[in-house]
């Protein structure tokens, strides 16, 4: 603020008006005070809290008691007197009216007026504005229309002032003009004032940092560290409400000579303050962080922008690339770390600190950088390391004992990455030796690819597969004593995917994969034996030849279930090739059926050779069984296809040959179709399942034998008993109620016995058709050979059926 502000605040008793009254008075009398004070009326308290105002006859404002008590704004410490003050007031009011649009005085327009104001200010020894409880101005907000400088009593002592911030109790706020004392008598009243341009107070810690920073700037100016070595043209430092708060646009510049003397005086007190600060450094709270922003600008040739925010220092060089030393950052870090003092001597050596060099191209779009010095000190575990220079630190500059770890001893990176977060930064990659080792690689289960928990039964597996394999093997051994088969069935083709998610879908494929991985239940016992060998005392060691050698039993092979095998070897559907566009005749239909029967016999032979245990029979026995049961197999398969596809209403010989009711009425077709429909009706009545059908078809293959017996009769009996048990398993799999299993078994075996009578009638028709050449029915070569060998045996009665029930 300019120094003439004190004059403007004197003797307002005859010109100050409030509210709407000021407008009329100012316009009638020509006094500009009314119009000037009108913008401040919006900040006044309610009219009830102020004395009632009246308009004096001379155009001034007053109260009813003005004759008794004098003016409202009369200072209790004394009146400003003299004609020079009144003339100066009139001149200033006219000048304020001329510059009312900008709200402040331009002191550069009239240098003589500035010198006159300074001389008047020096002659003034009392405060201009009353701050007592009874003063109205003490409770009014002062707008920018009343820029003022508070003149105070007493001598100035910067050391006393800094001592207050350093933790001492003593001198109150003071200005930097050489006068000290209490700024006001009642600080609570001033706190209620809403100053438009007032800035918040800063903490003790911030004051020390900014004073040290000012010392650094003075050092650059006096020592020639900057490019031109000139003084700062504009310096704006916030020192709280008790300091000299300058305006924002820099119009309140001081006289050059007075400014130079003021800087020299301030520099001397700064040196005293640093010594005083080192003595009381332990009393400064290190956790206080500044919440204000300090902006420091220089001229256009060498201008810096210094921005201080909590935990961040950002300095930008606009044109050239000279260095700027941040002493305030060092002082703040010194108190944060509790390290040794930071030297700030003014000599040939540069002040140790952090140097930031920035160009306009490199500072555009960059985020605020965080110095690594805010990290806490680490123990000096690497004192033998080579002491390296800090980033941006010129060669030859020795760093003092500032209590901060050097760049070589700090595990934090010296370079500042704008993309990294400010908190929790992990820069361990800067020092490869201190990087954290990567976590241990997890082992994978060889069965389901889950995370393995260890080596179980000789294979690295997870706990789930370990328990599954143990239960599967123990259950398989328990069932081996009864039927010798495992009950795990694969609904697919024994190639299910076993992983962490789908390992429980198919136990059969999971158990197979466990065996393929090499899991062995005896591996646990063998491991215990090996441990016993290692820990056995040497004195009781036996000769190696006498040591029992553990015998690893042969791993059990994965035996597929019988039903799964029967499903796999089931013959494919064969097409007849019948031309349905031509008219149907008995001869053409029977010829097509014989040709289809010949293809089905060939597939039946392949099917029989694929049956488990059938190849164990003698070759003659295999041929005898096929010759005696070929029509059983084809008629039973026809009944299943008709039951499955047509629900027993029609005969489905092939997908392209279905005998409906009309075709059944053809000559020589009715008798055959009636016998075949009986089989279809039995499937419908019993609701035979597919598993039951597969087992019953194998039993039909083994249901007709020669009377003299087979050459491998014992093997035949064993195979037949095996498939009878498989039929029982298929019944148990279907029926939920155990009491109905035997009843179901009885019904199915009765169906097998009834097949003997139904097929016997079909054989008679087949033999008649084959012998009677007048029908002109063609037979395939293989089927003709089978019928030729079978006819004598049936006439002689050399074959007999194997029945489950006696007639």
Curated annotation (Swiss-Prot):
Location relative to the cell: Cytoplasm; Nucleus; Mitochondrion; Cytoplasm, Cytoskeleton, Spindle
DNA-binding region residue numbers: 445-519
NR LBD domain mapped to chain residues: 554-788
Pfam families, alphabetized: GCR, Hormone_recep, zf-C4
ZnF endpoints (NR C4-type): 445-465, 490-514
Region listing for Hinge, in residue ranges: 520-553
Stretches the record annotates as Disordered: 1-47, 246-284, 412-438
Disulfide bonding pattern of the chain: none
Stretches with biased composition (Low complexity): 412-421
Superkingdom of this protein's organism: Eukaryota
A biological process term (GO) from this entry: cellular response to steroid hormone stimulus
InterPro entries: Glcrtcd_rcpt, NHR-like_dom_sf, Nucl_hrmn_rcpt_lig-bd, Nuclear_hormone_rcpt_NR3, Nuclear_hrmn_rcpt, Znf_hrmn_rcpt, Znf_NHR/GATA
SUPFAM superfamilies the record matches: Glucocorticoid receptor-like (DNA-binding domain), Nuclear receptor ligand-binding domain
Keyword set includes Transferase: no
Gene Ontology cellular component list: centrosome; cytoplasm; mitochondrion; nuclear speck; nucleus; spindle
Keywords attached to this entry: Chromatin regulator, Cytoplasm, Cytoskeleton, DNA-binding, Lipid-binding, Metal-binding, Mitochondrion, Nucleus, Receptor, Steroid-binding, Transcription, Transcription regulation, Zinc, Zinc-finger
A molecular-function term among this protein's GO annotations: steroid hormone binding
Biased composition (Basic residues): 257-282
Domain comment (free text): Composed of three domains: a modulating N-terminal domain, a DNA-binding domain and a C-terminal ligand-binding domain. The ligand-binding domain is required for correct chromosome segregation during mitosis although ligand binding is not required.
Subunit-structure text: Heteromultimeric cytoplasmic complex with HSP90. Upon ligand binding the complex undergoes a conformation change and moves to the nucleus, where it dissociates. Binds to DNA as a homodimer, and as heterodimer with NR3C2. Interaction with numerous other transcription factors modulates transcription activation.
Family, similarity comment: Belongs to the nuclear hormone receptor family. NR3 subfamily.
Entry protein name: Glucocorticoid receptor
Taxonomic source organism: Paralichthys olivaceus (Bastard halibut)
């Amino acid at each position: 603020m300019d120094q003439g502000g004190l004059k403007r605040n004197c003797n307002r008793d005859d010109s100050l008006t409030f509210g709407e009254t000021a407008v009329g008075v100012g316009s009638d009398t020509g006094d500009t005070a009314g119009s000037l004070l009108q913008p401040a009326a919006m900040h006044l308290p309610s009219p009830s809290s102020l004395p009632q105002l009246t308009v004096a006859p001379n155009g001034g404002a007053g109260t009813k008691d003005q004759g008794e008590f004098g003016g409202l704004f009369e200072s209790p410490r004394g009146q400003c007197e003299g004609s020079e003050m009144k003339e100066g007031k009139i001149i200033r009011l006219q000048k304020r009216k001329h510059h009312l649009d900008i709200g402040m005085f331009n002191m550069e327009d009239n240098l003589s007026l500035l010198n006159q104001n300074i001389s008047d200010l020096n002659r003034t020894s009392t405060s201009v504005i009353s701050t007592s409880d009874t003063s109205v101005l003490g409770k009014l907000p002062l707008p920018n229309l009343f820029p003022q400088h508070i003149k105070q009593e007493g001598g100035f002592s910067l050391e006393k002032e800094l001592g207050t911030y350093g933790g001492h109790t003593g001198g109150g706020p003071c200005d930097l003009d050489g006068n000290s004392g209490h700024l006001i008598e009642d600080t609570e009243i001033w706190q209620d004032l809403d100053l438009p341009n007032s800035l918040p107070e800063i903490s003790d810690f911030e004051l020390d940092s900014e004073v040290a920073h000012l010392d650094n700037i003075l050092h650059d100016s006096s020592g020639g560290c900057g490019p031109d070595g000139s003084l700062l043209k504009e310096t704006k430092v916030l020192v709280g409400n008790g300091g000299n708060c300058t305006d924002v646009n820099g119009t309140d510049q001081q006289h050059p000579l007075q400014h130079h003397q003021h800087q020299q005086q301030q520099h001397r007190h700064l040196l005293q303050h640093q010594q005083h600060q080192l003595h009381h450094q332990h009393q400064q709270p290190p956790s206080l962080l500044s919440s204000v922003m300090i902006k420091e600008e220089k001229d256009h040739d060498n201008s810096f922008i210094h921005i201080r925010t909590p935990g961040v220092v950002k300095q930008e060089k606009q044109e050239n690339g000279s260095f700027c030393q941040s002493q305030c950052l060092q002082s703040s870090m010194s108190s944060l770390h509790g390290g040794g003092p930071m030297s700030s001597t003014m000599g040939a050596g540069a002040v140790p600190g952090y140097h930031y060099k920035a160009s306009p191209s490199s500072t555009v779009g960059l985020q605020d950088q965080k110095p690594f010095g805010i990290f806490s000190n680490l123990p000096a575990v690497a004192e033998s390391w080579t002491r390296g220079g800090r980033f941006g630190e010129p060669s030859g500059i020795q760093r003092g004992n500032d209590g901060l770890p050097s760049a070589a001893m700090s595990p934090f990176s010296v370079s500042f990455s704008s993309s990294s977060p400010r908190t929790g930064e992990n820069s361990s990659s800067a020092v490869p030796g201190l990087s954290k080792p990567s976590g241990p690689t997890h082992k994978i289960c060889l069965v389901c690819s889950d995370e393995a928990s260890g080596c179980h039964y000789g294979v690295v597996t997870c706990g789930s597969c370990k328990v599954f394999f143990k239960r599967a093997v123990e259950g398989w051994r328990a069932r081996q004593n009864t039927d010798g088969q495992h009950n795990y069935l694969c609904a697919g083709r024994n190639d299910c995917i076993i992983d962490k998610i789908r390992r429980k879908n198919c136990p059969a494929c999971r158990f197979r994969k466990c065996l393929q991985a090499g899991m062995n239940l005896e591996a646990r016992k063998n491991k215990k034996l090996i441990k016993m060998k290692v820990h056995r005392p040497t004195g009781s060691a036996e000769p190696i030849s006498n040591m029992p050698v553990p015998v690893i039993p042969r791993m059990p092979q994965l035996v597929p279930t019988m039903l799964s095998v029967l499903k796999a070897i089931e013959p494919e559907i064969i097409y007849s090739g019948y031309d349905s566009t031509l008219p149907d005749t008995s001869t053409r239909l029977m010829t097509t059926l014989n040709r289809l029967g010949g293809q089905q016999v060939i597939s039946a032979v392949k099917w029989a050779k694929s049956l488990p245990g059938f190849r164990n029979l003698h070759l003659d026995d295999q041929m005898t069984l096929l010759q005696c049961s070929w029509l059983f197999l084809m008629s039973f398969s026809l009944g299943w296809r008709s039951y499955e596809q047509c629900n027993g209403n029609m005969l489905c010989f092939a997908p392209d040959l279905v005998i409906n009711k009309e075709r059944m009425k053809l000559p020589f077709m009715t008798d055959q179709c009636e016998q075949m429909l009986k089989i279809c009706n039995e499937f419908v009545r019993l609701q035979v399942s597919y598993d039951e059908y597969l087992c019953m078809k194998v039993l039909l293959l083994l249901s007709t034998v020669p009377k003299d017996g087979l050459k491998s009769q014992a093997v035949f009996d064993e195979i037949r008993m095996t498939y009878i048990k498989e039929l029982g398993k298929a019944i148990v799999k279907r029926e939920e109620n155990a009491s109905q299993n035997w009843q179901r078994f009885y019904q199915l075996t009765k169906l097998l016995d009834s097949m003997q009578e139904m097929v016997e009638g079909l054989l008679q028709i087949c033999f008649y058709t084959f012998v009677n050449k007048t029908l002109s029915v063609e037979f395939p070569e293989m089927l003709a050979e089978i019928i030729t060998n079978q006819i004598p045996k049936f006439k002689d009665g050399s074959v007999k059926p194997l029945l489950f029930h006696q007639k």
